[in-house]
């Protein structure tokens, strides 16, 4: 069903004790840049519907999946949870980050009022199986990998990489994120509006990623950087110390 429909959300959450909110309208920087108002509206609406349904059913715990896009563009690295509200999400991906931030704060307000535990997990740049490889939806790992493979199949010696390669991200494998979510589901800790980063704690440049993809694909193919294209935030890396202390 479509979680933008509040009745669907209420039906999906019926009987749930713990809710993990993963539903989203999301894609890479190009996808969000092309529909900022629509992306904000959809993700805000989905989130509010989930919160209201969780409250209606008196669920015990609500786990939200946030976004590093919710941090301000000038936040000091590594990004720490207590700095989340010190900057305003902006740029091409700010619409998504703002929606996630508003939903998180709304969940905390309702949770405190009704005795529902709330926690927001903020993963880094997730990659792995079942990623979006579509041209207009992919994030950087899937996008770079797809362009490299397609270029090699077409007999080309280069593949395009957006930006100059200096932008950095905190890449985290999807299985690691899933394990952390599972830990949050079963944690003995009493959540009360907690925010926890989920990252590798390592800053990797897009150039490093492109070189690794080129080496993996093989055939002598090399990255060609296209500086005029969108890159989103310049540098991102998450501190995961709080998550380690809370979840182990």
Predicted regions and their residues:
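Hydrophobic positions on the long internal alpha-helix
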Residues: 46, 50-54, 106-107, 180, ...
């Amino acid at each position: 069903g479509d979680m933008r429909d509040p009745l669907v959300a209420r039906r999906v959450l019926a009987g749930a004790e713990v809710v993990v909110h993963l539903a989203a309208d999301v894609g890479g920087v190009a996808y969000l840049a092309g529909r900022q108002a629509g992306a904000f509206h959809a993700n805000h609406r989905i989130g509010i519907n989930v919160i209201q349904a969780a409250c209606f059913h008196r669920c015990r715990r609500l786990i939200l999946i946030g976004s590093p896009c919710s941090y301000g563009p000038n936040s000091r690295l590594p990004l720490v949870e207590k700095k989340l509200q010190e900057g305003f999400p902006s740029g091409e991906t700010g619409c998504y980050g703002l929606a996630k931030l508003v939903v998180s704060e709304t969940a905390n307000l309702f949770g405190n009022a009704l005795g529902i535990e709330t926690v927001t997990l903020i993963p880094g740049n997730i990659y792995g199986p079942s990623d979006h490889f579509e041209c207009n939806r992919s994030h950087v790992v899937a996008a770079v990998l797809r362009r490299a493979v397609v270029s090699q199949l077409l007999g080309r010696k280069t593949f395009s990489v957006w930006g100059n390669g200096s932008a950095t991200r905190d890449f985290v494998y999807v299985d690691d994120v899933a394990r952390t979510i599972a830990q949050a589901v079963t944690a003995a800790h009493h959540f009360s509006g907690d925010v926890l980063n989920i990252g590798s704690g390592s800053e990797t440049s897009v150039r490093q990623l492109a070189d690794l993809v080129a080496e993996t694909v093989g055939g002598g193919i090399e990255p060609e950087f296209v500086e005029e294209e969108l890159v989103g935030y310049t540098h991102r890396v998450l501190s995961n110390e709080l998550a380690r202390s809370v979840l182990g």
